[in-house]
């Protein structure tokens, strides 16, 4: 038997759906939830016959009379019934419905309408696979009893039900055995060949790291860097006496500890730059600790020996205090006195690096699949995802398929550190490659695989695992944060999204900002990425109440428009210190304010009603000021405060009221309090916040 929706019948009767719902309930005892509910055609015809001859105004009046006849007690009882009805479970599927689902699945398979998903999928991704609008998929989920937003995760079984509604069959994606695919046999000693050392230059800010690299590379970089410090990690290869050395250029300021530490992990030798006129400084000690932790040998370059205040012996004494005893003092730490500005003893320094590397016996097998690390990555408008890779073993060639973290690609083009196109790169050689599907993370490992299909499947598998781990981690963090807030008092949190032009800057800024956290305000970077600020970033910021910081990047037009609509704050910077100052200002705004109490109004209880499952309703007369729903309330009896809580409901006749002013009557209930009596005074108040002006 066919059915008709309430809104369609209301249209035929020329009345509002709301009025028809009331008439159905009061006059025909037909319960419907909303305008999308359906009723049998037979009932609809009967209703039309019975209401024939009545004008729309009569029908509306009839509905109003039915509604207005309710007492305040009826209103509360109706609301309770509605809440109970919401808890009624949906009936199980009939055999006929199950057979229909099986038929749809068979048809889908015959027509080739099959999609493949993993253990879970977001609503947005499912809509894209189904080639359906997201709103339609959300509506289908709601009808299936699942409330899910566009970015919400749904399990395989729920996705399967949704797809059945669209006549599409779902298959579970096979798990890829990653260890089997990436398994590489141990290299035979006879296949190993000498490889160039990978060197990182470290030291305190302004001690001459970039100047030393300039001198080595014969290229000026210092003058063009924003803020006077190196901002991005690069890699360069130089030749000395027929032998190659690869340099990683890591930032020298202590704010970029994360990038410098990552550089040490793939480094064979570290050149520690110490200014002869300045000695050991905090960042110098930090660099020494990183090298010791990574087990990387150090060659010390005592720089600026041409300056009048240079004191080499004092530097060596301070190095000895840090556990680095110079060779000429009886130790095993190589110290070379240099001047980057005067190009003095630079070749000697490089010879010491090669000597240290020779003692390490650095070897690799170039005749195998390439493996290595991402040094830097960025999104280029014209070229797409661009990654700087350091090959650590094997040989990487144009046309190879590679798996990089949770992204993949087939190398379309490869460039050396001078920008020259090359076809292959062996161990310890840095290259810039094009052809990746997305921008990888700096520090990700890359592996060459047999074909692009394998790389794509493994990347998608890693993404699924990462997504599941992130959801679980977020849940754990939420519980931990709740515990910590209870333990430490009310801790405020400033959520930040960081976007930058290169991945190294993202990590550096993240570390700098999180260092600003205090006992009162925690700074948390909830997301960091490379490239322009997008709509996805703004959506995340809206959901997380976060601000967006862009470092050398800008929002695209759509993102800027969405940020204006949603009131999301976007800040753009070129110098990291400006970002730190602005975040400090934002933190002051997050501090717990001081409070003072403001009395809103008082009312006298003149009558009480008791309703089972609801509690005691107080009929009141407002004496002065106003009563405000959800405001703090205290009950006063004979001049003594007997209870404090919030107003759980406030009504004026049958209608919910936000507030009721002096001289009017109202009905109210108080949260967790039923012992209210006639003659009691209800006092409504609020705590007004007074902002603090400093951390």
From Swiss-Prot:
SUPFAM superfamilies: Initiation factor IF2/eIF5b, domain 3 (SSF52156), P-loop containing nucleoside triphosphate hydrolases (SSF52540), Translation proteins (SSF50447). It is found in: Cytoplasm. Residues 303-306 are annotated as: G4. Residues 249-252 are annotated as: G3. It comes from the Bacteria. Its main location: cytoplasm. Residues 194-363 form the tr-type G domain. Residues 203-210 are annotated as: G1. Signal peptide: none annotated. One of its GO terms (molecular function) is GTP binding. GTP binds at residues 203-210, 249-253, 303-306. One of the essential components for the initiation of protein synthesis. Protects formylmethionyl-tRNA from spontaneous hydrolysis and promotes its binding to the 30S ribosomal subunits. Also involved in the hydrolysis of GTP during the formation of the 70S ribosomal complex. HAMAP family: IF_2_B. Belongs to the TRAFAC class translation factor GTPase superfamily. Classic translation factor GTPase family. IF-2 subfamily. This is Translation initiation factor IF-2. It comes from Clostridium beijerinckii (strain ATCC 51743 / NCIMB 8052).
């Amino acid at each position: 038997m066919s059915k008709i929706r309430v809104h369609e019948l209301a249209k035929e009767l020329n009345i509002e759906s709301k009025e028809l719902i009331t008439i159905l309930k009061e006059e025909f005892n037909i319960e419907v939830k909303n305008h999308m509910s359906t009723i049998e055609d037979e009932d609809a015809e009967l209703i039309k016959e019975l209401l024939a001859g009545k004008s729309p105004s009569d029908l509306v009046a009839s509905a109003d009379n039915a509604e207005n006849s309710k007492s305040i007690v009826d209103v509360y009882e109706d609301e309770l019934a509605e809440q109970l009805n919401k808890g009624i479970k949906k009936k199980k599927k009939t055999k006929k419905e199950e057979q229909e689902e099986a038929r749809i699945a068979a048809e889908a398979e015959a027509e080739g309408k099959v999609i493949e998903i993993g253990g879970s999928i977001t609503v947005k991704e499912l809509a894209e696979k189904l080639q359906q609008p997201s709103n339609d998929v959300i509506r289908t989920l709601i009808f299936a009893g699942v409330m899910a937003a566009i970015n919400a995760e749904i399990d395989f079984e729920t996705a399967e039900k949704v797809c059945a509604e669209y006549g599409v069959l779902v298959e579970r994606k096979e798990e890829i055995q990653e260890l089997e695919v990436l398994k590489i046999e141990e290299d035979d000693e006879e296949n190993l060949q000498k490889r160039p050392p990978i060197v990182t230059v470290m030291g305190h800010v302004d001690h001459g790291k970039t100047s030393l690299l300039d001198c080595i590379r014969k290229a000026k970089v210092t003058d063009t860097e924003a803020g006077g410090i190196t901002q991005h990690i690069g890699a360069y290869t130089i030749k000395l006496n027929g032998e190659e050395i690869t340099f990683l250029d890591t930032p020298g300021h202590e704010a970029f500890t994360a990038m410098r530490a990552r550089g040490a992990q793939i480094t064979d030798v570290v050149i520690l730059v110490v200014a002869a006129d300045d000695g050991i400084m905090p960042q110098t000690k930090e660099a020494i600790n990183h090298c010791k932790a990574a087990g990387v040998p150090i060659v010390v370059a005592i720089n600026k020996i041409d300056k009048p205040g240079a004191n080499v012996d004092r530097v060596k004494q301070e190095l000895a205090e840090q556990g680095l005893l110079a060779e000429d003092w009886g130790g095993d730490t190589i110290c070379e006195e240099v001047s980057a500005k005067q190009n003095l003893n630079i070749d000697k320094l490089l010879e010491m690096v090669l000597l240290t590397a020779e003692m390490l016996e650095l070897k690799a097998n170039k005749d195998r699949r390439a493996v290595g690390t991402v040094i830097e990555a960025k999104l280029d408008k014209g070229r797409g995802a661009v990654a700087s890779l350091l090959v650590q073993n094997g040989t990487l060639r144009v046309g190879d398929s590679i798996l990089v973290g949770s992204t993949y690609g087939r190398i379309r083009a490869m460039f050396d550190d001078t920008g020259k196109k090359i076809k292959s790169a062996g161990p310890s050689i840095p290259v810039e490659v094009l052809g990746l599907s997305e921008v990888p993370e700096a520090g990700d490992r890359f592996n060459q695989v047999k074909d692009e299909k394998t790389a794509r499947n493994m990347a998608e598998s890693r993404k699924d695992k990462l997504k599941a781990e992130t959801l679980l981690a977020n849940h754990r963090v939420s519980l931990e944060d709740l515990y910590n807030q209870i333990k430490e008092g009310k801790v405020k949190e400033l959520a930040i999204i960081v976007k930058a032009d290169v991945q190294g800057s993202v990590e550096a800024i993240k570390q700098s900002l999180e260092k600003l956290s205090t006992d009162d305000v925690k700074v948390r970077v909830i997301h960091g990425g490379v490239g322009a600020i997008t709509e996805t970033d703004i959506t995340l910021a809206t959901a997380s109440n976060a601000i967006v910081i862009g470092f050398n990047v800008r929002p695209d037009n759509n993102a800027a428009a969405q940020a204006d609509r949603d009131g999301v704050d976007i800040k753009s910077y070129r110098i990291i210190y400006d970002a730190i100052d602005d975040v400090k200002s934002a933190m002051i705004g997050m501090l717990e304010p001081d409070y003072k109490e403001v009395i809103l109004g008082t009312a006298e209880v003149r009558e009480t009603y008791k309703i089972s499952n609801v509690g005691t309703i107080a009929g009141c007369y407002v004496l002065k000021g106003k009563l405000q729903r959800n405001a703090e309330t205290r009950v006063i009896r004979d001049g003594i405060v007997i209870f404090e809580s919030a107003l759980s409901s406030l009504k004026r006749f049958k209608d919910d009221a936000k507030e009721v002013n002096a001289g009017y009557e109202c009905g109210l209930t108080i949260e967790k309090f039923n012992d209210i009596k006639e003659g009691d005074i209800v006092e409504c108040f609020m705590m007004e916040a007074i902002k603090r002006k400093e951390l």
